[in-house]
Each structure stands twice: as C-alpha cells, then as structure tokens.
Amino acid sequence: MRVGIFSNNVRRSLEVKAALTRRFLERHFIIDDENPEVVVTIGGDGTLLSAFHKYIDMLDKIRFVGVHTGHLGFYTDWRDDEIDDLVISLQSDNGQSVSYPLLDVFVTYKDSNKRDVFTALNEATIRRISSTMVTDIFIGGEFFERFRGDGLCVSTPTGSTAYNKSLGGAVVHPTLDVLQLTEVSSINNRVFRTLSSPMIIAPKDWITIEPEGAADFILTVDSDSYHKLKIKEIKFKISKKKIHFAKYRHTHFWHRVQTAFIGDEDAD
C-alpha cells in the first residue's frame, strides 16, 4: 500500500510522524506523498483541511485517516498513542470508506471574463471589508431575498459544526447531501427584511448571490481567504466530488458532537 503522511509542524506531531514512518517501513508499506492510496494526517482538523486542499485533484483516488495530537477533532479518529493499532488496521485494509459531501464555489468578476472554481470541505463565506454587504440571493434560480448585513456563510454538513454553528446554524449529519445558508448579522427593521434563519438547501438547487457595491469583498474557502474582489456573482452547489475516509473505526458523528460541545457530565 502507498501511504502519504501529512503533519503539522508541532513538535509532538513531528515525533508521531517519525515513529509512524518507521513502523510503516518495518511492515513494508511504501511512503509516497505524491501518489498515495491513503493519506494519514497528524495534528488536528486544521491539518486535515490543509491535506484536503493539497490532494484536492486526487480525491477520487485516496482515502484519509486522521491522527490527532491534541484534542479530539471531527476528522481525526486515532490518538497519537494508537499508531501501532492504526498500522495493523491498514495492513488488513479492505478498501472500505465513508464519504462526505463537499461544496463547489463558482465566482465571476465584474472586471473580467475569468471564472474561479473552489471546493470547500467545511464552508465558504462572503463579506465586505468596510461596510454593510447588500446582495440579492437566488435559490434554485428564483429570487429569494435582498440581504443586508455583515455577510453570508454556506456550509457543508461536516462544516455545520464549525463557523456555521457559531452563527446559530443547525448541526447537520454528514451523510445528508445538503448545503446550509446562514446569515451573518443581518439587518432587520421596518424597512429591511430577511428570513434571518438558517436554511437547508436541497442538493439539486444552486445558491446564487449577486452582491451590490464596491470592490472590497472578502471570500473565504475553508481556511483560505481572497481579498478586495470585484465580484459579480457567486454560485454555490453540492460538488460532484466527495471526500473519502478510511473506515477502520470511523467515530459516530453524534459522539463527536457530544464530545466536542457537551462533554462528560460526570466530569463536572
């Protein structure tokens, strides 16, 4: 089996990477960071996000496994003291995986015919730098509302527990092929009206926004940000691609949610 190892630069992560590399070589794995079958990430969710974007053109060929060297993350199933068990599981690999939906973002600009396409694992956001953002929102090709506020967040089911949740969005099980549109500090009064509620969007529907005004928009795609954009239109849709995780002992989603946000009541 060809295995790639992707680590952050924290000392503990680098120690685990070195130990894991030795064990892989002892058991005759091929270390191949360029064309892996399985990518093992060492760190946390941010490390896995970075690995996802590095291998984004190979998602149909690889599966991810996360080893966490800090707190339990949503994408990391193994602790740093369990690498021997991980190697044994990889040796008996049967190719099983669990797959989660991704978000495609299509951006067109006012000053050119260029169109950029991005893919997000968690979410994409749009906001203005210096003042209120005003934008028309279309769902499934039909006008829905004119939004005024700080910005908008479109998230995947796995991303629903990230920035989306801090905005008051719903937590969505990652086996559902849906998107979530959440407003960021919308303005609602006698003059201006928005739904002011998170929306779950069906997989067949595009979310389209046409922002109004100056060229000072910021677009974020996961942890990447793009500044001072002259945006004409952004379309969001469930991607045809998916991310695949090796299914050795993939942690139950609601257990992850309980651990991350509620914890052990007996510990209080």
From Swiss-Prot:
Gene3D superfamilies assigned to the protein according to its UniProt record, in alphabetical order: Probable inorganic polyphosphate/atp-NAD kinase, domain 1 (3.40.50.10330), Probable inorganic polyphosphate/atp-NAD kinase, domain 2 (2.60.200.30)
Reported function: Involved in the regulation of the intracellular balance of NAD and NADP, and is a key enzyme in the biosynthesis of NADP. Catalyzes specifically the phosphorylation on 2'-hydroxyl of the adenosine moiety of NAD to yield NADP.
Claim: ATP-binding is one of the keywords in the record: yes
Subcellular location, principal: cytoplasm
Molecular function terms, GO-annotated: ATP binding; metal ion binding; NAD binding; NAD+ kinase activity
GO BP term (any one): NAD metabolic process
UniProt-listed Enzyme Commission number(s): 2.7.1.23
One matching Pfam family: NAD_kinase
GO cellular component: cytoplasm
Family: Belongs to the NAD kinase family.
Lineage: Bacteria, Bacillati, Bacillota, Bacilli, Lactobacillales
Keywords on record: ATP-binding, Cytoplasm, Kinase, NAD, NADP, Nucleotide-binding, Transferase
Species of origin: Ligilactobacillus salivarius (strain UCC118) (Lactobacillus salivarius)
Enzyme class, first EC level, given as a word: transferase
Binding sites annotated in the UniProt record for NAD(+): D45, G46, N122, E123, R148, D150, T161, A162, Y163, N164, K165, S166
InterPro entries for this protein: ATP-NAD_kinase_N, ATP-NAD_kinase_PpnK-typ_C, NAD/diacylglycerol_kinase_sf, NADK
Keyword presence, Cytoplasm: yes
Subcellular location: Cytoplasm
Residues annotated as catalytic: D45 (proton acceptor)
Reactions accelerated catalytically: NAD(+) + ATP = ADP + NADP(+) + H(+)
Protein name according to UniProt: NAD kinase
Cofactors demanded by this protein: a divalent metal cation
